[in-house]
Amino acid sequence: MPEQSLPPTVFHMLEKNVGNQIRVILDASYGFEGTLAAVTREPAGIWLSDAEAVILRATIAQPIPQVASREERSEIFVHLNSVQRIEVIHGPSHR
C-alpha cells in the first residue's frame, strides 16, 4: 500500500511564502500589506516587514475590493485568529 502524505497545513503554506509580498485581510475593509518575514506557531501568527495598513473599498461597479488608501507601518505581528484571508501578491510591488 503506498504511503499517503498528509496535506500541507496553513503553517507549511505560509512558510513556503516567507520573503514574498502578501496582503492580510482582517475584515471586509481593512488589512495589511508587506513582506512575510516569519511564521510563528505559539502564538499562531505572522510577522510582516515593510508593512502598510490598507483600506479596501468595493463598489457596485467594482465588487472586488481594491486598495483605496495606505498608511506606512514598520514591523507588524498579526495573530492568525484575526485573519479572514491572506493573498500572495505576484509580480511587481503594488506600492
Listing of model-derived features with the role each one plays in the protein:
Residues 2-95:
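Conserved RNA-binding domains used in RNP assembly and mRNA/RNA metabolism
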